[in-house]
Every structure is written in structure tokens, then in C-alpha cells.
Amino acid sequence: MVIGLTGGIGTGKSTVSRKLREKGYPVIDLDIISREVIAYPEVIDELVRNFGNEILEEQNEISGKKSISRNKLRQTVFKDEKKVAVLNSIMHPPIIEEMRRQIKELRQKHKTVFVEVQLLFEVKLEKEFDMTVLVYANRKTQIERVLKRDGRSEGEVQEIINAQMNMDEKRKLSNYIIENNGNSEMLDLEIEKFIKKLGI
């Protein structure tokens, strides 16, 4: 079984991933794959062709080796749907290809494989998984966690949450919800309940 795990900023999906790993389940992190893919020479060339040299890291100009600044790229495409669509068309095919390769490899040894995907529903990846699981937290909890963790202003956090798909919308699309409005012990119980229900 391949399970897609998603959530929003500050809902605790990475914490759930860590706890699942501690229990011995393999978890593929699509964010890690995307960091690897963005370093592929052909991807760098395609991104520069579309978004210009301003998305490159400055410190690599001496060595002549090009690399993309994720921060600069984010600022370039943020709030521009056309640019986001172009970025996705460049990044998603190699990311999905690598994800499938890792799933295939892990399925040889493991009955269940989890894949952590922040934008699972936004980029319509549901068909890649046997089931989808949402790590859910209410908006107040999301804001509190991100303020504590990232040192951003509340306005910035609100803006990020508003830019993401509504959590209640994600609830409707998910096969299972892991509630995470409480502490670590409560989350452990939620994960245990989920594992028991699935019999994995």
C-alpha cells in the first residue's frame, strides 16, 4: 500500500512522518526529492531559460557552477499563477519519476510506503496513491506553531495559509484525517489509532 501524507503549514505532517519512521515505516519526502531535482543541470537550464539569471545563487559565480536559489525562485513565481504553472511543468515530471522509482524500490522490502507531499491535492497527485491521509490542525493552532517555529510575523503566516488550499477543502478530499490540535502524546494516540484501523 502506498499512502500519500499531506497537510498545511504548521499542521505537523513532518512530525507525523518522523514518528512513522521511528515505528519503522519508510517515508519518502517529496520536498527532499524536489531539492535533488532542482540541482539537475537540465532542470537548472530550463528554469534559467524561463525565469532568468536572477534566480541563480550568487556565491557560485566564481566557480562557474550554476545552482538555483530556492528563495529567489519562490519570490519570482509567488502569486503569479502563470509562472507557477510553468515552474510545475518543469519540476513535476522529474519529481514524479524519482518518486515512482523510490516507491518501486521500497515496495520490494516493505508492505506499506508513505509519501509526504505538501501540495498533494493542489497538483492532483491523488491517483499516485492507494489512499490519502491529511494531518489536520485548526487555523489558530497552525498560526501559533509557525510563529513559534519560524519567527515570522503573524501577517506573513496568515498570507502563507491564505495562499494554500483551504484545510476544510483538503478534509473533504482525504481518505483519513489525523487530528493534530493537541500535544505530542495526543498525536501518538492518533497515529496508533490510524495504524490499527489500517492493520498495517
Language model segments and positions:
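ATP-dependent small-molecule kinase phosphotransfer cores
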Residues: 36-109
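Hydrophobic anchor at the beta1->P-loop junction of P-loop NTPases
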Residues: 3-5
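Small-molecule kinase domains that catalyze NTP-dependent phosphoryl transfer to phosphate-bearing small molecules
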Residues: 99, 106, 127-128, 148, ...
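ATP-binding Walker
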Residues: 11
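Short beta-strand-centered segment that lines the nucleotide-binding/catalytic pocket of NTP-utilizing
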Residues: 26-40
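Walker A/P-loop
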Residues: 14
